Amino acid sequence: MATFSQKPAEVEKKWVIIDAEGLVVGRLASIIAMRLRGKHKATFTPHVDDGDNVIVINAEKVVFTGKKYSDKVYYWHTGYAGGIKERSARQIIEGRFPERVLEKAVERMVPRGPLGRRQMKNLRVYAGSNHPHEAQQPVALDVAALNKKNVRSA
């Protein structure tokens, strides 16, 4: 029997909504990256974008384990000499765009390249509980019920 290869025209994309309140960042990002790539489907094909559209709400309420909330540092470079910049996870979550912590975690779990960039466009992350995608009728995915370690008990 020949290996199955999904054609781009045969892809069926679903809409999934995840409430990130109280969920651990890395574990949540791993599940989201798998959904975006389509690896949860039996029809997974490496060169085809057959993942789902994922909506994440309450991204400002994600949690870190251990001391990562205060100690984890995100670096970037401005392009100028001596232009290395840094922010802690705490500064970003308490700042203007707290959803970027989760976006960056997922982005670093998706392969780099044209297909990875296209798959990342299927991710919508919102800091609060409101989102403009009710018309797509997203199905709720309860990440907390998948594994007890996905939720941080304070």
UniProtKB/Swiss-Prot annotation:
GO cellular component: cytosolic large ribosomal subunit
GO biological process terms, semicolon-separated: negative regulation of translation; translation
Key words, A-Z: Ribonucleoprotein, Ribosomal protein
A GO molecular function held by the record: mRNA binding
CDD domains the record matches: Ribosomal_L13
Disulfide bonds: none
InterPro entries assigned to the protein according to its UniProt record, in alphabetical order: Ribosomal_uL13, Ribosomal_uL13_bac-type, Ribosomal_uL13_sf
Lineage: superkingdom: Bacteria
Family to which this protein belongs: Belongs to the universal ribosomal protein uL13 family.
Subunit note: Part of the 50S ribosomal subunit.
Free-text function comment from the UniProt entry: This protein is one of the early assembly proteins of the 50S ribosomal subunit, although it is not seen to bind rRNA by itself. It is important during the early stages of 50S assembly.
HAMAP family referenced in this protein's UniProt entry, alphabetically: Ribosomal_uL13 (MF_01366)
Protein name stated in the entry: Large ribosomal subunit protein uL13
Origin species: Rhizobium johnstonii (strain DSM 114642 / LMG 32736 / 3841)
